[in-house]
Amino acid sequence: MKDIIIASFYKFIPLNDFESLREPILTKMHEIGIKGTIILAHEGVNGGFAGNREQMNVFYDYLRSDSRFADLHFKETYDNKNPFDKAKVKLRKEIVTMGVQKVDPSYNAGTYLSPEEWHQFIQDPNVILLDTRNDYEYELGTFKNAINPDIENFREFPDYVQRNLIDKKDKKIAMFCTGGIRCEKTTAYMKELGFEHVYQLHDGILNYLESIPESESLWEGKCFVFDDRVAVDQKLDRVYPQLPQDYKYEREQK
């Protein structure tokens, strides 16, 4: 039985006091024994952390004790080993960096599709299926027939849209990412530009892999994750170190 719980979460909400939240959260992580990384910015909070069930429940309760975080949703996966080596709380300009001002996913994100709805929706040949992740993530695994924007980092995504999609504002566009946060921004950005039919996979690829049987899955390959597991398969089991040794090296240089 895998006794380490790995949780990812995010919330877009104005945090005027985000800088003052860093030390209390970090202190609590050390006190409980939680390892992972949490990012705070004016636009909200984003993070991934891990521990045993007792530790995680205590930390969930701590975070939710702030009324602004009372409805935080934690997406859980499981492993035999903690994929984080220490506790970190970082202050940033954005909780996921796209570099575009005045994009507010808290009120203008794309339409959510459950894994089951997504599974049916992306089989429509008239739907543009767009992977919002980086090129090395796409190369490791993606959905069947997904478009690769061929970007090295998320900051390049707006330029991709301007160069390749700006004349397709009337088309149905379905976007996906690992856990959902990047799609919150990409869909909000595209709606600001006037795209009319923008959809996103709720809770991302990890939710789809958990929900759709492997025998029916439209996912092909592995799913990159931002911790020491490097990637997971369709059963959400870690596949590193089955990956080539130089893959992790190349990833760390990006």
From Swiss-Prot:
It catalyses: uridine(34) in tRNA + AH2 + O2 = 5-hydroxyuridine(34) in tRNA + A + H2O. Its EC number is 1.14.-.-. CDD domains: RHOD_YceA (cd01518). This is tRNA uridine(34) hydroxylase. InterPro entries: Rhodanese-like_dom, Rhodanese-like_dom_sf, TrhO, TRHO_N. One of its GO terms (biological process) is tRNA modification. GO terms for molecular function: oxidoreductase activity, acting on paired donors, with incorporation or reduction of molecular oxygen. The active site is at residue 177. Residues 123-217 form the Rhodanese domain. Pfam families: Rhodanese, UPF0176_N. Belongs to the TrhO family.
